[in-house]
Amino acid sequence: MNRRLLLAAGCLALLAVTSGCLGIGTGPVSADRLDSEPAAPYEWETNRTAHVTIQENTQFRTVMETNSSTIELYRRDGFGGTNPLSVQSVRYRYPNGTVITGSEIQNRSGEVRQTRDETIVALPDGAPPSGGALAFTSGGTPKRFTLPTYVEGTYEVVLPPDRRLDFPIFGQVSPGNYETERDAGGQVHVIWAEPVTADTVSIRFYLQRDLYIFGGIVALVGAVGGGGLFYYRRQIDRLRQRRLEMGIDVEIDDDDEGPPPGMR
């Protein structure tokens, strides 16, 4: 009986926690987050359909053309589902160049709302389905950028300063058919000049110093391994010499089938 009560209580507690977790973060995004200032001005004048600038703090700024009155922002969870993309510093630019904040989007009958699966941005009154641009800031992970292709078209991703992707072990870009270039400040731009048809854009990059650290580790491992091999060979040579001095090692012909030495 006690076990049944404990099991029932545990199930109720799990249900309560699960229900609470599922409801966390749903609803309209707060005005403080929507209207916060981005770390740097958005790249409104880009000639790409989507332009992403990755910051050194792993956050990234995105500007993308709108081709629908509603945009769903999400991340794939690896289990066939999605999670809402957490956004801040939301801005919308009308085709005439007027820029409004996220709270102004809401005040003009639009919305920026988070559900359990995605963040929904509905364009404000007077915004055409295409021709405008949506900008927002979100968070990522160190040395890796992955984002679904929310809009069809060309893409450009700017890496943080001093980041590279040339070394195959540490650098990787997907999908292919891209090109890279460096701007006047030395930052690497990854460009898909042709419309991207893949579901996700993914870039793995590294700091320049990572190569030096990797090279140092390889050299250290090589030195330790070489030293260990040398020590092992020396010990074997010493053991062989001692056996010879003690008369244990006696060379015999391969064809000699007689008794061992000392028993003849």
Regions found by a protein language model. Name each.
Residues G27, R93-T101, R108, V218-G225:
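Structured, soluble extracytoplasmic/luminal domains of envelope-associated proteins
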Residues P95-F167:
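Membrane-proximal low-complexity regions enriched in glycine and acidic/polar residues
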Residues A50-I54, E104-T115, S174-D183:
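Short, exposed beta-strand/loop patches in secreted or surface proteins that constitute
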